[in-house]
Design a protein with these regions (language model features):
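The feature marks helicase ATPase cores and/or their adjacent C-terminal helical subdomains
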Residues: 1-607
């Protein structure tokens, strides 16, 4: 085992680096545990090392390891680490994938076909489902439904599923008008009968199917998997945990959960903000030494955490600066000051200057960034277009157009190698403006994809519609890439939401404090500015939130969770940006910050 660990360290860690004692304790642990890993403590690296250890342990047996996480990016990161350790392909009996893919593939599909036999199941994004729902609801809506009234959003309604009732699988909760409810229920059930469902529905199907054959699965699963490793456990929903508990008998399968409970931000806008991950104190293991940032940032992160985090310490080689705050008038002023601060600090610190990591301004909502930076902030145009992103862009346009017109599932065919090669030829013709080649290539591809008779009636019309949409989408992307440096003087600073920074490491991060929190979005609700909600976190002493919280304290907890994620991203420089118009509301704030070690940057000198 010692030799294996040395080999893992050599291939997975930076030169001359070793796993810490608390990391090794987790890597070697063979019992069920809850691993609480702080920001920058090497959670994914430890998880990858643990997987390698287990693969070696079960080699030659018929049992596999099941690894579940929440995003394809996380899956790719784990697989990339395993390739460094000589594992190029994940084969049965092992499984590494997203939790949603696991339930969709092994349970939801089987449940669906049990109910609707050979009907094709199509799992669509929420926005596509909403469009299809609107089209169906529009035909069924009651006579009193005004034309100028917006159509309902199915994502915002609670739907009860009863797959034992073959007459009506779905029933919306909370709609009292019987005609409205009939139209809503009828629309959802019609789409289900056509095989058009969402990921949320897949979990409900899985739940029904697992309950139906629970004892069989609990007997079979331990024969297939010896271990379940659950990554990002803090983002796992109550229903997902219930499904895992129903499937995996924890007396026969070792279950090891990894995550940071303080980074649970995906559910903060919903009604249920409680953490679904119930950490067992007797099984808890902590990885609390961060190598991402130094003690100045550690102290900031500890102070915004929703719970006391005394054991978070730094063993980082990075020399983190003291925290800075910037008072700004508008977006240009903030960009100018932040950019100047970075330049000044780069002139004093070689490691900061040489770092190629991101420089970021993050805010809670897209709208905050749009209001502050205007056209400089483009939600979709912050990434460089690569060969793969060209492909993603093309597939996004094509699938949306086809999904609106036909009920077929095109994704599997589009994954075929020969179709991918065709698509790259079409993209090339699109970029080089070779219209005839573009049209011929698209017609050939559509002939292979679409079997619906309606297609032959208006083939040219559909081709023209898709080409127009492709040209608009690609021209916007290409234009944004070519002109971004001209429009945006500080193009090396990324503008984004806090949610999109999760999992990233930056050289410098500024959290823009210009968001208003309104509980439940009720018209009569009081609103709380983020500066008001976080000001207690800028004191020397940690201020704990009470167990029973009033409305303002609930919003403060949300703000702290978001600040914790944002302010734990950088290696060297952490900042906050405060709008000038908030200073008069908080007259002591500047002095409070200065008294607790924050430095103010005014773009003339460092105070």
């Amino acid at each position: 085992m010692t030799e294996l660990l040395s080999s893992i360290e050599m291939n997975l860690l930076p030169v001359n680096c070793k796993f810490s004692e608390e990391q090794k304790e987790v890597i070697y642990e063979n019992n069920s545990i809850d691993v609480v890993a702080g920001p920058g403590t090497g959670k994914t690296t430890v998880l990858t090392a643990r997987i390698k250890m287990l693969f070696e342990e079960v080699n030659g047996s018929r049992k596999g390891i099941c690894v579940l996480t929440h995003t394809n990016v996380a899956v790719d990161e784990i697989k990339s680490g395993l390739r460094k350790l000589g594992i190029d392909e994940i084969k049965r009996p092992h499984f590494i994938g997203t939790i949603q893919d696991f339930f969709n593939t092994f349970f939801a599909k089987k449940a669906f076909h049990l109910l609707l036999k050979d009907k094709k199941m199509r799992v669509v994004d929420d926005d596509i489902f909403r469009e299809k729902f609107h089209k169906v609801f529009n035909l069924r809506k009651p006579g009193f439904y005004r034309e100028d009234r917006s159509l309902p959003n199915p994502e915002n309604k609670k739907i009860e599923w009863n797959f034992n009732d073959t007459q009506q699988f779905a029933s919306v909760v909370g709609i009292k008008n019987p005609q409205y409810k009939k139209a809503f229920d009828g629309s959802i059930n019609f789409l289900f009968s056509k095989g058009i469902i969402t990921n949320k529905c897949c979990l409900e199907l899985s739940n029904w199917y697992i309950e139906r054959y629970k004892e069989v699965f609990r007997a079979v699963i331990p024969r297939r998997f010896s271990h379940l490793l659950l990554d990002e456990a803090q983002d796992t929903s109550v229903l997902q945990f219930n499904l895992i508990s129903a499937l995996f008998d924890d007396e026969k399968v070792t279950i090891q959960k990894f995550g940071d409970p303080y980074q649970a931000i995906y559910n903060i806008w919903g009604g249920d903000t409680d953490l679904a991950w119930e950490i067992d104190d007797s099984k808890e293991r902590r990885i609390s030494q961060t190598s991402r940032f130094g003690e100045p940032i550690v102290n900031i992160v500890k102070n915004v955490c929703i719970k006391t985090y005394e054991d978070l310490t730094s063993n980082s080689k990075h020399e983190s600066f003291p925290p800075y705050f910037i008072i700004y008038d508008n977006g240009d002023d903030l960009l100018s000051k932040y950019s100047s601060l970075i330049e000044e600090l780069e002139s004093t610190n070689e490691s900061f200057k040489l770092s190629q990591k991101l420089k970021v301004i993050a805010s809670v909502r897209h709208k905050d960034l749009e209001d502050t930076f205007g056209d400089k902030y483009k939600r979709e145009n912050m990434k460089k277009l690569t060969r793969n992103s060209y492909l993603d862009l093309f597939l996004s346009v094509l699938l949306k157009k086809l999904s609106k017109k036909f009920d077929e599932d095109f994704e599997d065919n589009l994954k075929k190698f020969q179709n991918r090669m065709q698509i790259f030829e079409i993209i090339k013709a699109l970029i080089e403006d070779e219209n005839e080649k573009l049209k011929d290539g698209l017609r050939t591809l559509l002939d292979e994809l679409v079997t619906n008779e309606e297609f032959s009636v208006d083939k040219d019309g559909l081709c023209t519609e898709i080409i127009e949409s492709l040209k608009i989408t690609f021209s916007l992307e290409l234009e944004s890439q070519s002109s971004e440096s001209e429009e945006y003087e500080y193009s090396n600073i990324k503008l984004c939401t806090v949610h999109s920074t999760k999992g990233e490491t930056h050289k410098a991060t500024l959290l823009m404090l210009d968001t208003t929190f309104t509980p439940d979005y009720r018209k009569d609700s009081l609103s709380y500015h983020i500066v008001e909600l976080l000001k207690n976190c800028f004191h020397d002493e940690y201020v704990e939130l009470p167990e029973k919280k009033n409305e303002k304290e609930i919003e403060s907890e949300k703000a702290r969770k978001l600040a914790y994620v944002a302010l734990s991203r950088p290696t060297h420089l952490v900042c906050i940006g405060i709008p000038n118009n908030q200073i008069e509301n908080e007259p002591t704030l500047i002095q409070d910050l200065l008294d607790t070690g924050w430095k103010q940057y005014t773009d003339q000198d460092v105070i």
